[in-house]
Amino acid sequence: MTSLQHIINRRDWENPITVQVNQVKAHSPLNGFKTIEDARENTQSQKKSLNGQWDFKLFDKPEAVDESLLYEKISKELSGDWQSITVPSNWQLHGFDKPIYCNVKYPFAVNPPFVPSDNPTGCYRTEFTITPEQLTQRNHIIFEGVNSAFHLWCNGQWVGYSQDSRLPSEFDLSELLVVGTNRIAVMVIRWSDGSYLEDQDMWWLSGIFRDVNLLTKPQSQIRDVFITPDLDACYRDATLHIKTAINAPNNYQVAVQIFDGKTSLCEPKIQSTNNKRVDEKGGWSDVVFQTIAIRSPKKWTAETPYLYRCVVSLLDEQGNTVDVEAYNIGFRKVEMLNGQLCVNGKPLLIRGVNRHEHHPENGHAVSTADMIEDIKLMKQNNFNAVRTAHYPNHPLFYELCDELGLYVVDEANIETHGMFPMGRLASDPLWAGAFMSRYTQMVERDKNHASIIIWSLGNECGHGANHDAMYGWSKSFDPSRPVQYEGGGANTTATDIICPMYSRVDTDIKDDAVPKYSIKKWLSLPGETRPLILCEYAHAMGNSLGSFDDYWQAFREYPRLQGGFIWDWVDQGLSKIDENGKHYWAYGGDFGDELNDRQFCINGLLFPDRTPHPSLFEAKYSQQHLQFTLREQNQNQNQNQYSIDVFSDYVFRHTDNEKLVWQLIQNGVCVEQGEMALNIAPQSTHTLTIKTKTAFEHGAQYYLNLDVALINDSHFANANHVMDSEQFKLINSNNLNSKSFASATEKSVISVNETDSHLSIENNTFKLVFNQQSGLIEQWLQDDTQVISSPLVDNFYRAPLDNDIGVSEVDNLDPNAWEARWSRAGIGQWQRTCSSINAVQSSVDVRITCVFNYEFNGVLQAQTQWLYTLNNTGTISLNVDVNLNDTLPPMPRIGLSTTINKQSDTKVNWLGLGPFENYPDRKSAARFGYYSLSLNELYTPYIFPTDNGLRSDCQLLSINNLIVTGAFLFAASEYSQNMLTQAKHTNELIADDCIHVHIDHQHMGVGGDDSWSPSTHKEYLLEQKNYNYSLTLTGGITT
């Protein structure tokens, strides 16, 4: 019997050569069906779940574990500090130990293969029952995921060891089991040498976090099946190659049938072992090779995910069924043709996203419902591909991708981002076995999934001989799929696809170590013929995804630019309640983890609860499959007619479940609508005609809104879900007619009263009082009602976005980041003085001119001149002239701000882009219209508070008693910019009694090519030193 002391002395968890002991060889997932019918219907599997409540006890280190606890019988009453824990789960999320988040750095001293002596060790125990029938068969226990390494005992006997937290660990318990109650004990070690290969940008969490199953199969059994579909040169007829490994006598046979539902497509194909000569010495005695031809099957693609069922049976010498396995299969062929990645002979455009397995309460333990929700949301938002960043996912995820239709890049659980150099272990022969094990076992497990079209060697671990070995094995074992790997420059010999991360569209990035060309340039390099698919791009951290549409213009223009995978899908925030009972999303450092990278795990298109960020709408729009062109407009008094070309970017499917819903918009409001069926062949253009009867009014603005919605429920969305959208501004449209607002009249003479301290302008409907010293409005009344609660002032500052801060690693901030440059220039801290104020009255109006100087550290940074022109209705025409110091960096914003008293029913109404938040470089998806939302609806609760809620291209704003017209951007919030800047979490935000209103002439873009360098494109930077803008402000008078 192997003692615990012997195991500890052996220290498998600090030996890179030992990645497993006594583990069953990797294979495709098995279920052990008894009949063909059960296998076909996927029922009555002989796999039993051991999930549930297990005993748990946490120790400081492996050496502290009491050996007797692993052997003793389990009593019904927990004792000796044992507690109950859910399996699967991460123990840190059940109050044991603490979560740690780091982006690049390891959370321990780097000295491979050694790990800290203080090494939290969780011991698990549970019991299960074995029947007499099961005892006559083979019984394997399968741990689908344990982080990071573990030893296993059964009935007091040591069984084996395993590491690689993201792949199955399977052990044969057959010789150790008894009829009746059996007990297992698991000692899970938080840090192992395997942790050096798992330095992904995610939470470090531990425990048995995926399913545990007991698989019972007969002594003679199927132990592996490898199914490879192929299509003929016309992509019409198919051939299925099936390789079955068995443990059975030589006179046993293997039968294969293909089912479409309950209908068999062929007679059973029966074959004995050793039926194929593989080299000069002969064939395999335990492997059966079979080929089945299928005429004109339906093809699998992400657009048309049609699946068949392949049932493989083991027959004894009498022809009786002994063991059955079954797999969903899709007939599809992946190729590189003419420098493009193709499926079934057609080039793809990858609308991809990187996805971590993350749940805000359960950490890395994700349920079937969680996976289905993610896949459906991806499909609903026009994603067709997912990269399993950066490890093999739960095995069910691939079945769901097969069924619902997503292309998958399956990635090995290898990342050494914190190593110096990054590729240190990739070039070390001592670690070759660990690298190879992680890759080969992934491929062995997942090889039968139609959805997997690309294998990935891992992420951010440099490039070395170990990668070349993995690549070579892959091309030999599974030549049906390409291999990608970004490390070492994205275009090494270990990748079939140029797969850079965060390369720009047109600009090279300087990097002395590896090339970082623009994606357009990369294609034109001498001798380069591979396609380019960005493995990561458009870093969606917080308020981000600016200029995303630029990528999609390039993808559609250059055939070998075949898309990419956005980083990333969901914010990795963990749910937490503060001492006041307020909920917030936690990130690095919030659990006492002193070594952390703060909020860099918060970079998804969705919040942790899967609520969308505004950036998701931009991604959905840019990636949509239908492209619209307004080709012709014919307008007359009785009927208007519009010809619209609709190009379908679908590659394989007709739009046979779509309808076009159109709306005619007048001054932001729908005045006419209709719908029509939309049936377009893939990769073709259909011209449709829309006729409207609304007569155009002079001075009004007209837009045509187009939405393509589902007619019936689909396998991923309900009827009426909108997949594609567009808006066209129609001819004869003008900006909102200024005559809609009250103009000057000859009634009510304006009086101007001036003292040393104040300047007052008023009549019987309004009153405006300026402070002579500050030059600011102290009081503005309209019909005895207060319009604003604080002065109108210049505003140049925004609460820094993550992209402004340039955060990647807390101890490695970019000194050239926008926030750092703004801070050095004192933006947001300037001292304002009024150098002059004067008023001139005419017969029809009063003009007040105020000049303001802004200083920082005794240096003049800016000067502004405000010219107010007041007529006798109280309407203010405001002109602002801004002159900036030539030494200033590009500004965050140019505009003004004020506050307004909050009312219980405050609604913000505007005519401009909406309804969701949009910024100058992220507004393609937004539509021009008239919107009315509450303050809460305007607010985007970014986990790390920043500037938010902007609406662009506005012409009208109405909040309580304030009305603004002109051309501007605005934001209205219960939180000040200072509060947003100071807060680190949303629970720290305290709503003010007032509304903070920001009216911007110009606002800098959000950027988003990455989040650690100044990535806002030049056309969205405020680099000018002189600005002039005009607005009209009224105190609630409209007609």
Swiss-Prot record:
Database matches in SUPFAM superfamilies: (Trans)glycosidases, beta-Galactosidase/glucuronidase domain, Galactose mutarotase-like, Galactose-binding domain-like
Documented EC number(s): 3.2.1.23
Binding positions for Na(+) per the UniProt entry: 201, 600, 603
Gene3D superfamilies xref list: 2.70.98.10, Galactose-binding domain-like, Glycosidases, Immunoglobulins
InterPro entries membership: B-gal_small/dom_5 (IPR004199), Bact_Beta-galactosidase (IPR050347), Beta-gal/glucu_dom_sf (IPR036156), Gal_mutarotase_sf_dom (IPR011013), Galactose-bd-like_sf (IPR008979), GH-type_carb-bd (IPR014718), Glyco_hydro_2 (IPR006101), Glyco_hydro_2_AS (IPR023232)
Site entry: Important for ensuring that an appropriate proportion of lactose is converted to allolactose: 1012
Textual note on the cofactor: Binds 2 magnesium ions per monomer. Binds 1 sodium ion per monomer.
GO biological process: lactose catabolic process
Active site residues per record: 460 (proton donor), 536 (nucleophile)
Matches recorded under NCBIfam families: PRK09525.1
Protein name in the entry: Beta-galactosidase
